[in-house]
Amino acid sequence: MDLTILLQVILQGLMLGAMYGLVSLGMTLIFVTTGLMNFAHGSFMAVAMYLALSLFTAFHFDPYVSVFITVPTLFIIGWILFRFVVRRLLEVHILMAAQVTLGMLWVIESVLSTIYGNNIQSVPTVIGSSKVYLGPLVVTGPYLVTFVVAAIVGVLLFLLLQKTDFGRSVRALMQDRKAAELMGIRVDRTQTAVFGLGLALLGLAGPLVVPMISVSPFVGLQFTLFAFMIMVFGGSSNLLGSVVGGLMFGLVDSLGRFFFTGNIASLIPFSALVLVLLLRPGGLLGEK
Amino acid sequence: MLKVENVTAGYLQSPVLREVSLQLEDNECACVVGANGAGKSTLMSLISGLMRPSSGSIMFNETSLIGLSPSKIVDLGIIQVPEGRRLFPRMTVAENLLLGARNARARPETKASFEKVYHLFPILEERGKQKAGTLSGGQQQMLAIARGLMAKPKVLLLDEPSIGLSPILVAEIFKTVGGLVNDGISVLLVEQNVRAALAVSSHGFLVERGRIVLSGKSQDLVEESAIKRGFIGG
């Protein structure tokens, strides 16, 4: 078996995994600042992907251009949804808020199905067939762009959390909510911004991966599951864990699809997760 | 001046606090003492806006605190150092202090505040880059108080600062607390250690099962038998 091909599979897996990591990071940020499990997380990614499709169909926008529209759009959607719907339910009971995200999952699926039909679709990009040579390995344009963008955004997020006032407020809220309130941190505002940010990350990931991953109205739940698995894999309250988990997930998934086919390949990442949790119940980087 | 009047709070059937009244004058240190579960921490939560009373009033000078959000109450200069420290464990000492100074009044004076608290607690400057969760109990308490001071408090609410500390550390910390009134800070001290609390305050209130059963000048209260019964660390 050709080692080059194996390395290529690994490389592509890691590159895509970086973006999965960002998607999961958004979900983790929402979880640690609000305690809410966003069941509709993957659905919003699907929304972003379909937005890219529409922008292509209507205006021939390349997905890499659509990103500049989908990111602010998803942020605003997230902000409004949290501010007017989720937050009120959170005040009542966290389970009600979780329930509403579950509801959003089905609503989004139905709406997407009505507008776009049930077929699997993907969006082409001008750099779709361009190749970059890294030594003996070949990487196609979309994979490289996705990885580079994910890396840059990852670093920016790190700087946001470490160096800015807002970032400090988020970390404080994560570590001790009561103390954060006593410092004068506006918990509701911070949570709203984090929710918007989580969805903005989906607005980024959607168009970037749509040249590589096809979309149908029903992928929402699948993406949510992936993001959730990565979150748990990395240690549920650990942000770095989500990134590392994403990379590992991309790797395992890519290798799984290379060596196995169809249904068995889909089982590989789940099996890996179960294995890791058996050995380290807190996740890879979580607390024991 | 902080004035709590006839405040009742907690569950309808069995309120945690019943018709509690107390006041804290400007530049004064007053203490609220009593056994565990008597309702002392609930009082702190009420003043800080984390809880609402079912009846009664809480006034800071001319402003009513009831219904204000916790962040508005912090903006007014009423700062709580909560029970159990509640530091941000994975953030450094310096970051914890920085977070203390984030309210609008305190922010412009951040640099000066750092100098002040490092002068009061030099060990914190030494350990500036250390994660707060790795400090010893006494150092954590110092950091918690310092973090409260960074917020430029007019009123400092101290909830059980002596818990888990050795008598020597308690004495050291209480000495610092006593000196705060000279800086124009009024201190409301909630404590189980009655002796230490009365020694550092000018007025005291004894809480028993949700009611104020005794109040007066600290030097007078020391003699009361009810207080003597409740002596901890005595």
Describe the function of each predicted region.
Chain B
Residues 131-135:
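Conserved ABC ATPase signature
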Residues 12, 68, 93-111, 120-122, ...:
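ABC-type ATPase nucleotide-binding domains, specifically the catalytic core motifs of the NBD
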